A protein has these predicted regions:
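N-terminal secretory targeting signals
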Residues: 1-19
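RNase H-like nuclease fold core
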Residues: 14-16, 20-77, 81, 85-90
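A composition-driven surface/loop motif
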Residues: 167-230
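Phosphate/pyrophosphate-recognition segments in soluble nucleotide-handling domains
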Residues: 18-32, 155-185
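RNase H catalytic domain
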Residues: 39-46, 83-155, 161, 165-166
Length: 230
């Protein structure tokens, strides 16, 4: 690539190389893989972030778990990193069926939504797609809906955002009641933006951060839908 690589891509390449060294893909694993990818940012935007990809071979059923820490990023950039890690990890040529709970990532990667932000990453994405002969199928999966692959990717991305501080991660798993109350509103979310908004708000409350008046107003509006439906 002619321009300097982004922080995200540098970390992705390191994580992929380490995983290949520790658990190499061999002939018995075939060329068809399934991946669940995710990203997490503790203080979106420009806060500590993490990405993850849980990759499984259709032939051998072996599973690889990739995760990386980003000192400063955003939710969407971390989500991109998770998907890109899966793309770079599987063999080329090969086939990858990838699941992401980010409508933004799925729709932009498939060309359904216009690219308005993170243009450096999407230019890199185009270059990587041309370089690698990977037949990619990309599907959206609802987050926090008890899908084991998605849940595991979420756990790894959250742990990576904390720079693999297991003690801190365990504390975040003990969800506070305010954060849990926001999580219960997820079925009321309309579109990917509101889904991401609710996850961000739950994350802020979990870490003891206050909401801005605008954030509180949006949260109240979403909660009112549930009351109106009662």
């Amino acid at each position: 690539m002619s321009r300097p690589e982004s922080l995200e891509l540098r970390v992705i390449r390191q994580v992929v190389a380490e995983q290949h060294a520790q658990q190499p893909i061999d002939a018995a694993d075939g060329a068809r893989f399934i991946a669940y990818t995710d990203g997490s940012c503790l203080r979106n935007p420009d806060g500590p972030a993490g990405f993850a990809a849980v990759v499984r071979s259709e032939a051998s059923d072996r599973v690889w778990e990739l995760a990386g820490h980003l000192p400063s990023s955003t939710n969407n950039r971390a989500e991109w990193a998770g998907l890109t890690a899966a793309l770079l990890f599987v063999p080329s040529p090969g086939h990858l069926l990838a699941f992401s709970d980010s409508q933004y990532i799925v729709q932009v990667a498939l060309g359904q939504w216009k690219r308005k932000a993170n243009l450096d990453l999407w230019q890199t994405w185009d270059e990587l797609r041309r370089e690698r002969a990977v037949d990619l199928e990309l599907r959206w999966v609802r987050g926090h809906a008890a899908d084991p692959g998605n849940e595991r990717a979420d756990e790894l991305a959250s742990l990576a955002a904390l720079n693999f501080d297991h003690a801190a991660w365990i504390r975040t798993r003990a969800i506070s009641e305010p954060a849990r109350a926001v999580q219960r509103l997820q079925p009321l979310a309309r579109g990917d933006w509101e889904g991401r908004f609710l996850r961000d708000v739950a994350n802020r409350l979990q870490h003891g951060l206050r909401l801005s008046p605008r954030q509180q107003a949006v949260l109240d509006r979403i909660a009112q839908r549930g009351k109106d439906a009662e």
